[in-house]
Protein backbone atom coordinates (compact mmCIF):
# COMPACT_ATOMS: atom_id res chain seq x y z
CA UNK A 1 0.00 0.00 0.00
CA UNK A 2 1.58 3.30 -1.08
CA UNK A 3 1.28 6.74 0.50
CA UNK A 4 -1.59 7.71 -1.80
CA UNK A 5 -3.65 4.74 -0.63
CA UNK A 6 -2.90 5.52 3.01
CA UNK A 7 -3.97 9.13 2.43
CA UNK A 8 -7.17 7.92 0.74
CA UNK A 9 -7.93 5.68 3.72
CA UNK A 10 -7.50 8.59 6.10
CA UNK A 11 -9.77 10.79 3.98
CA UNK A 12 -12.42 8.07 3.85
CA UNK A 13 -12.37 7.63 7.64
CA UNK A 14 -12.62 11.36 8.29
CA UNK A 15 -15.34 12.01 5.72
CA UNK A 16 -17.53 8.91 6.06
CA UNK A 17 -16.58 7.75 9.55
CA UNK A 18 -16.41 11.03 11.45
CA UNK A 19 -18.75 13.11 9.28
CA UNK A 20 -16.30 15.89 8.45
CA UNK A 21 -16.95 18.03 5.38
CA UNK A 22 -14.53 17.86 2.46
CA UNK A 23 -13.20 21.29 3.45
CA UNK A 24 -12.54 20.06 6.99
CA UNK A 25 -10.83 16.93 5.66
CA UNK A 26 -8.67 19.14 3.44
CA UNK A 27 -7.60 21.14 6.49
CA UNK A 28 -6.82 17.99 8.47
CA UNK A 29 -4.69 16.55 5.68
CA UNK A 30 -3.15 19.81 4.56
CA UNK A 31 -4.36 19.40 0.97
CA UNK A 32 -6.81 21.16 -1.31
CA UNK A 33 -10.53 20.35 -1.44
CA UNK A 34 -10.28 18.98 -5.04
CA UNK A 35 -7.54 16.64 -3.80
CA UNK A 36 -9.87 15.37 -1.08
CA UNK A 37 -12.51 14.65 -3.72
CA UNK A 38 -9.97 12.62 -5.70
CA UNK A 39 -8.89 10.75 -2.57
CA UNK A 40 -12.50 9.84 -1.76
CA UNK A 41 -13.00 8.58 -5.32
CA UNK A 42 -9.84 6.51 -5.00
CA UNK A 43 -11.10 5.11 -1.72
CA UNK A 44 -14.35 3.99 -3.36
CA UNK A 45 -12.48 2.47 -6.30
CA UNK A 46 -10.18 0.54 -3.95
CA UNK A 47 -13.12 -0.73 -1.94
CA UNK A 48 -12.05 1.08 1.25
CA UNK A 49 -15.61 2.29 1.64
CA UNK A 50 -18.87 0.78 0.41
CA UNK A 51 -22.02 2.82 0.24
CA UNK A 52 -25.24 0.88 0.69
CA UNK A 53 -28.63 2.43 0.02
CA UNK A 54 -31.69 0.73 1.44
CA UNK A 55 -34.80 1.87 -0.41
CA UNK A 56 -37.85 0.14 1.15
CA UNK A 57 -39.79 0.73 -2.07
CA UNK A 58 -37.61 -1.85 -3.82
CA UNK A 59 -39.11 -4.74 -1.85
CA UNK A 60 -42.37 -3.56 -0.32
CA UNK A 61 -44.67 -1.37 -2.37
CA UNK A 62 -48.12 -1.49 -3.86
CA UNK A 63 -46.60 -1.64 -7.33
CA UNK A 64 -44.50 -4.69 -6.44
CA UNK A 65 -47.53 -6.40 -4.91
CA UNK A 66 -49.64 -5.71 -7.99
CA UNK A 67 -46.90 -7.05 -10.26
CA UNK A 68 -46.64 -10.23 -8.19
CA UNK A 69 -50.39 -10.73 -8.38
CA UNK A 70 -50.74 -9.87 -12.06
CA UNK A 71 -48.01 -12.22 -13.25
CA UNK A 72 -48.13 -14.78 -10.41
CA UNK A 73 -44.51 -14.21 -9.43
CA UNK A 74 -42.73 -15.33 -6.27
CA UNK A 75 -40.91 -12.04 -5.78
CA UNK A 76 -40.68 -8.62 -7.42
CA UNK A 77 -37.93 -6.09 -6.69
CA UNK A 78 -38.27 -2.54 -7.98
CA UNK A 79 -35.28 -0.46 -9.01
CA UNK A 80 -35.79 3.24 -8.29
CA UNK A 81 -33.37 5.26 -10.46
CA UNK A 82 -32.76 8.71 -8.99
CA UNK A 83 -32.65 10.31 -12.43
CA UNK A 84 -33.34 9.55 -16.07
CA UNK A 85 -30.85 7.93 -18.41
CA UNK A 86 -30.07 4.45 -19.68
CA UNK A 87 -26.76 4.23 -17.83
CA UNK A 88 -28.45 5.06 -14.52
CA UNK A 89 -31.23 2.56 -15.22
CA UNK A 90 -28.76 -0.22 -16.04
CA UNK A 91 -26.75 0.48 -12.91
CA UNK A 92 -29.83 0.39 -10.66
CA UNK A 93 -31.22 -2.77 -12.26
CA UNK A 94 -27.84 -4.39 -11.82
CA UNK A 95 -27.56 -3.33 -8.19
CA UNK A 96 -31.01 -4.61 -7.22
CA UNK A 97 -30.48 -7.79 -9.24
CA UNK A 98 -27.16 -8.41 -7.50
CA UNK A 99 -28.79 -7.94 -4.09
CA UNK A 100 -31.51 -10.47 -4.92
CA UNK A 101 -28.98 -13.05 -6.12
CA UNK A 102 -26.98 -12.55 -2.93
CA UNK A 103 -30.08 -13.70 -1.05
CA UNK A 104 -30.81 -16.65 -3.34
CA UNK A 105 -27.38 -18.24 -3.83
CA UNK A 106 -26.38 -20.69 -1.08
CA UNK A 107 -23.83 -23.49 -0.69
CA UNK A 108 -23.95 -25.88 -3.64
CA UNK A 109 -26.11 -23.69 -5.88
CA UNK A 110 -25.93 -24.43 -9.59
CA UNK A 111 -26.43 -20.99 -11.14
CA UNK A 112 -27.18 -20.50 -14.84
CA UNK A 113 -26.18 -17.12 -16.28
CA UNK A 114 -27.04 -15.45 -19.57
CA UNK A 115 -25.27 -12.42 -21.01
CA UNK A 116 -26.09 -8.89 -22.17
CA UNK A 117 -25.65 -5.34 -20.91
CA UNK A 118 -28.04 -5.89 -18.02
CA UNK A 119 -26.34 -9.12 -16.96
CA UNK A 120 -22.96 -7.41 -17.10
CA UNK A 121 -24.31 -4.66 -14.85
CA UNK A 122 -25.52 -7.29 -12.38
CA UNK A 123 -22.14 -9.03 -12.42
CA UNK A 124 -20.15 -5.88 -11.70
CA UNK A 125 -22.23 -5.12 -8.59
CA UNK A 126 -22.17 -8.54 -6.95
CA UNK A 127 -20.57 -8.64 -3.53
CA UNK A 128 -18.38 -11.49 -2.38
CA UNK A 129 -20.39 -14.08 -0.47
CA UNK A 130 -18.97 -16.81 1.73
CA UNK A 131 -20.46 -19.84 -0.02
CA UNK A 132 -18.92 -23.08 -1.25
CA UNK A 133 -19.64 -25.60 -3.96
CA UNK A 134 -21.29 -23.06 -6.28
CA UNK A 135 -21.00 -23.58 -10.04
CA UNK A 136 -21.72 -20.97 -12.70
CA UNK A 137 -23.11 -22.33 -15.97
CA UNK A 138 -23.24 -20.25 -19.15
CA UNK A 139 -26.73 -20.67 -20.60
CA UNK A 140 -25.93 -19.75 -24.21
CA UNK A 141 -23.01 -19.22 -26.53
CA UNK A 142 -21.46 -15.78 -26.43
CA UNK A 143 -18.85 -15.43 -29.17
CA UNK A 144 -19.32 -12.47 -31.50
CA UNK A 145 -18.44 -12.27 -35.19
CA UNK A 146 -18.64 -8.47 -35.19
CA UNK A 147 -17.15 -5.53 -33.28
CA UNK A 148 -19.95 -5.84 -30.71
CA UNK A 149 -19.00 -7.55 -27.45
CA UNK A 150 -21.35 -9.70 -25.39
CA UNK A 151 -19.12 -9.40 -22.29
CA UNK A 152 -19.95 -13.04 -21.63
CA UNK A 153 -16.52 -14.00 -20.26
CA UNK A 154 -16.28 -10.95 -18.00
CA UNK A 155 -19.83 -11.53 -16.78
CA UNK A 156 -19.19 -15.18 -15.95
CA UNK A 157 -15.86 -14.27 -14.36
CA UNK A 158 -17.45 -11.70 -12.06
CA UNK A 159 -20.10 -14.21 -10.95
CA UNK A 160 -17.37 -16.76 -10.21
CA UNK A 161 -15.37 -14.22 -8.23
CA UNK A 162 -18.37 -13.18 -6.11
CA UNK A 163 -19.49 -16.70 -5.28
CA UNK A 164 -16.05 -18.40 -5.25
CA UNK A 165 -17.39 -20.62 -8.00
CA UNK A 166 -16.22 -22.81 -10.84
CA UNK A 167 -17.25 -21.81 -14.37
CA UNK A 168 -18.81 -23.99 -17.05
CA UNK A 169 -18.59 -21.93 -20.23
CA UNK A 170 -19.77 -22.22 -23.82
CA UNK A 171 -16.97 -20.81 -26.02
CA UNK A 172 -19.25 -20.75 -29.06
CA UNK A 173 -21.32 -18.33 -31.11
CA UNK A 174 -24.92 -18.25 -29.95
CA UNK A 175 -26.22 -18.71 -33.52
CA UNK A 176 -24.46 -20.96 -36.04
CA UNK A 177 -24.47 -20.59 -39.81
CA UNK A 178 -26.24 -23.91 -40.28
CA UNK A 179 -28.21 -26.45 -38.29
CA UNK A 180 -25.80 -29.17 -39.40
CA UNK A 181 -22.75 -27.37 -37.98
CA UNK A 182 -24.57 -26.66 -34.73
CA UNK A 183 -25.55 -30.32 -34.33
CA UNK A 184 -21.99 -31.49 -34.94
CA UNK A 185 -20.62 -29.07 -32.33
CA UNK A 186 -23.28 -30.07 -29.81
CA UNK A 187 -22.10 -33.67 -30.07
CA UNK A 188 -18.77 -32.71 -28.52
CA UNK A 189 -18.63 -34.29 -25.06
CA UNK A 190 -17.64 -31.08 -23.28
CA UNK A 191 -20.22 -28.91 -25.04
CA UNK A 192 -22.95 -31.50 -24.53
CA UNK A 193 -22.19 -31.68 -20.81
CA UNK A 194 -22.40 -27.89 -20.35
CA UNK A 195 -25.67 -27.71 -22.28
CA UNK A 196 -27.10 -30.56 -20.21
CA UNK A 197 -25.97 -28.86 -17.01
CA UNK A 198 -27.67 -25.66 -18.11
CA UNK A 199 -30.98 -27.48 -18.24
CA UNK A 200 -30.65 -28.62 -14.62
CA UNK A 201 -29.49 -25.47 -12.82
CA UNK A 202 -31.16 -24.44 -9.56
CA UNK A 203 -31.34 -20.77 -10.51
CA UNK A 204 -31.29 -19.09 -13.92
CA UNK A 205 -30.64 -15.35 -14.17
CA UNK A 206 -31.30 -13.70 -17.51
CA UNK A 207 -32.63 -10.61 -19.21
CA UNK A 208 -34.88 -10.00 -22.19
CA UNK A 209 -34.22 -7.71 -25.10
CA UNK A 210 -36.39 -5.63 -27.36
CA UNK A 211 -35.93 -6.45 -31.03
CA UNK A 212 -34.88 -3.67 -33.37
CA UNK A 213 -32.07 -3.12 -35.83
CA UNK A 214 -29.83 -1.74 -33.05
CA UNK A 215 -30.32 -4.74 -30.73
CA UNK A 216 -27.10 -6.44 -29.63
CA UNK A 217 -28.54 -9.86 -30.47
CA UNK A 218 -29.04 -8.79 -34.09
CA UNK A 219 -25.57 -7.33 -34.50
CA UNK A 220 -23.17 -10.14 -33.63
CA UNK A 221 -22.49 -11.04 -37.27
CA UNK A 222 -24.56 -14.23 -37.13
CA UNK A 223 -27.72 -13.24 -39.01
CA UNK A 224 -28.40 -12.32 -42.61
CA UNK A 225 -30.02 -9.01 -43.50
CA UNK A 226 -33.22 -10.85 -44.42
CA UNK A 227 -33.27 -12.65 -41.07
CA UNK A 228 -32.76 -9.40 -39.20
CA UNK A 229 -35.61 -7.76 -41.08
CA UNK A 230 -37.92 -10.71 -40.39
CA UNK A 231 -37.05 -10.73 -36.70
CA UNK A 232 -37.70 -6.99 -36.39
CA UNK A 233 -41.03 -7.54 -38.13
CA UNK A 234 -42.15 -10.62 -36.17
CA UNK A 235 -40.41 -10.67 -32.79
CA UNK A 236 -41.36 -8.68 -29.71
CA UNK A 237 -38.38 -9.81 -27.66
CA UNK A 238 -35.73 -12.41 -26.95
CA UNK A 239 -34.76 -14.39 -23.87
CA UNK A 240 -31.43 -16.22 -23.95
CA UNK A 241 -31.34 -15.35 -27.68
CA UNK A 242 -34.60 -17.20 -28.31
CA UNK A 243 -36.71 -14.72 -30.26
CA UNK A 244 -40.43 -14.78 -29.48
CA UNK A 245 -43.55 -13.15 -30.89
CA UNK A 246 -46.25 -11.21 -29.05
CA UNK A 247 -48.25 -14.43 -28.69
CA UNK A 248 -45.27 -16.27 -27.19
CA UNK A 249 -44.47 -18.38 -30.25
CA UNK A 250 -40.98 -18.60 -31.73
CA UNK A 251 -40.55 -15.73 -34.17
CA UNK A 252 -38.25 -17.41 -36.71
CA UNK A 253 -37.95 -21.20 -36.27
CA UNK A 254 -35.09 -21.50 -38.77
CA UNK A 255 -32.96 -19.16 -36.63
CA UNK A 256 -34.04 -20.84 -33.41
CA UNK A 257 -32.91 -24.19 -34.82
CA UNK A 258 -29.38 -22.78 -35.23
CA UNK A 259 -29.24 -21.29 -31.73
CA UNK A 260 -26.99 -22.83 -29.07
CA UNK A 261 -28.21 -22.65 -25.51
CA UNK A 262 -31.16 -23.23 -23.28
CA UNK A 263 -34.57 -23.33 -24.97
CA UNK A 264 -37.58 -21.45 -23.63
CA UNK A 265 -39.29 -24.69 -22.64
CA UNK A 266 -36.21 -25.84 -20.71
CA UNK A 267 -35.89 -22.41 -19.12
CA UNK A 268 -39.42 -22.75 -17.73
CA UNK A 269 -38.43 -25.97 -15.97
CA UNK A 270 -35.74 -24.26 -13.89
CA UNK A 271 -37.06 -23.96 -10.30
CA UNK A 272 -35.96 -20.34 -9.77
CA UNK A 273 -35.88 -18.01 -12.78
CA UNK A 274 -34.71 -14.46 -12.18
CA UNK A 275 -35.54 -11.95 -14.91
CA UNK A 276 -33.69 -8.63 -14.67
CA UNK A 277 -34.97 -6.12 -17.21
CA UNK A 278 -36.33 -2.61 -17.47
CA UNK A 279 -36.94 0.41 -19.64
CA UNK A 280 -39.98 1.47 -21.64
CA UNK A 281 -38.52 0.02 -24.85
CA UNK A 282 -38.53 -3.45 -23.25
CA UNK A 283 -42.05 -3.28 -21.81
CA UNK A 284 -43.66 -5.51 -24.44
CA UNK A 285 -40.82 -8.05 -24.27
CA UNK A 286 -41.05 -8.20 -20.47
CA UNK A 287 -44.85 -8.51 -20.54
CA UNK A 288 -44.81 -11.50 -22.90
CA UNK A 289 -41.96 -13.15 -20.99
CA UNK A 290 -43.91 -12.88 -17.76
CA UNK A 291 -47.22 -13.97 -19.26
CA UNK A 292 -45.57 -17.06 -20.71
CA UNK A 293 -44.08 -18.07 -17.37
CA UNK A 294 -40.42 -17.46 -18.15
CA UNK A 295 -39.74 -15.97 -14.70
CA UNK A 296 -40.48 -16.68 -11.06
CA UNK A 297 -38.60 -13.62 -9.76
CA UNK A 298 -38.47 -10.18 -11.36
CA UNK A 299 -36.20 -7.16 -11.04
CA UNK A 300 -37.65 -4.19 -12.91
CA UNK A 301 -37.68 -0.42 -12.63
CA UNK A 302 -40.71 1.23 -11.08
CA UNK A 303 -41.66 3.23 -14.19
CA UNK A 304 -41.73 0.16 -16.46
CA UNK A 305 -43.67 -1.81 -13.86
CA UNK A 306 -46.28 0.96 -13.78
CA UNK A 307 -46.42 0.88 -17.57
CA UNK A 308 -47.10 -2.88 -17.51
CA UNK A 309 -49.79 -2.52 -14.88
CA UNK A 310 -51.51 0.07 -17.06
CA UNK A 311 -51.88 -2.44 -19.90
CA UNK A 312 -55.23 -4.11 -20.40
CA UNK A 313 -55.09 -7.49 -18.67
CA UNK A 314 -54.54 -9.94 -21.54
CA UNK A 315 -55.31 -13.62 -21.54
CA UNK A 316 -52.17 -15.23 -20.20
CA UNK A 317 -50.76 -17.79 -22.62
CA UNK A 318 -48.96 -20.55 -20.78
CA UNK A 319 -46.55 -23.20 -21.87
CA UNK A 320 -48.03 -26.64 -22.55
CA UNK A 321 -46.47 -29.73 -21.05
CA UNK A 322 -44.34 -30.74 -23.99
CA UNK A 323 -42.05 -28.42 -25.97
CA UNK A 324 -42.68 -28.18 -29.68
CA UNK A 325 -46.33 -29.16 -29.44
CA UNK A 326 -48.96 -26.94 -31.09
CA UNK A 327 -49.24 -23.71 -29.15
CA UNK A 328 -45.91 -24.19 -27.40
CA UNK A 329 -43.71 -21.09 -27.05
CA UNK A 330 -40.99 -23.20 -28.67
CA UNK A 331 -43.07 -23.80 -31.78
CA UNK A 332 -44.05 -21.38 -34.51
CA UNK A 333 -47.75 -21.54 -33.66
CA UNK A 334 -49.29 -19.13 -31.15
CA UNK A 335 -50.32 -20.00 -27.64
CA UNK A 336 -54.01 -20.45 -27.04
CA UNK A 337 -54.39 -22.40 -23.79
CA UNK A 338 -53.86 -21.31 -20.22
CA UNK A 339 -52.77 -23.26 -17.17
Where are these regions (language model features)?
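Conserved phosphate- and dinucleotide-binding cores of soluble alpha/beta proteins
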Residues: 2-12, 16-30, 35-41, 47-54, ...
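Short N-terminal secondary-structure initiator segments
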Residues: 7-26, 67-84, 109-114, 119-120
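HTH-adjacent hinge/linker in prokaryotic transcriptional regulators
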Residues: 34, 38-110, 124-132, 144-149, ...
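Conserved beta-strand termini and adjacent loop/short-helix elements that scaffold enzyme active sites
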Residues: 79-81, 139, 170-172
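Gly/Ser/Thr-rich loops at beta-strand to alpha-helix junctions
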Residues: 111-121, 211-212, 279-282
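Short Gly/Thr/Asp-enriched flexible loops that form oxyanion-binding sites at enzyme active sites
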Residues: 118-129, 216-225
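Catalytic or ion-translocation cores adjacent to nucleophile or general acid/base/metal-coordination motifs
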Residues: 135-143
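Intrinsically disordered, low-complexity tandem-repeat regions
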Residues: 315-333
